[in-house]
């Protein structure tokens, strides 16, 4: 059975923690614990947080590939993105949303150690959402944005 593809992002105070167990303990004090998956993303989240705080007037939007695929399909996805069936399911969704089959197949079937087909497919889904946003066709989640303690918008564009 497929699990949720979306996990809670850590709060800003967690970004300064150097140890997973301490970060998890702190996170639990303010709600949910911190998953290992979230913890492994901390360096990139920290880097992005610095960019967002330093470039407040720049339009930087958040999105999520699994929500993009769900919106393209009009339904929940059936398979995990890293499974063969999941790659095929997502490839077909992209093809049905105006991506060329030859383009998708070329990159999905590459056999390169450092290259993961699901990362390429996710990038295509994010491109789809970015194009919708540029054209004013995006789905906003939530409809009305909220802002964090630094005044940074908390809303995804799908």
Regions found by a protein language model. Name each.
Residues 1-124, 129-158:
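Phosphate- and other anionic-substrate recognition elements at nucleic-acid/protein interfaces
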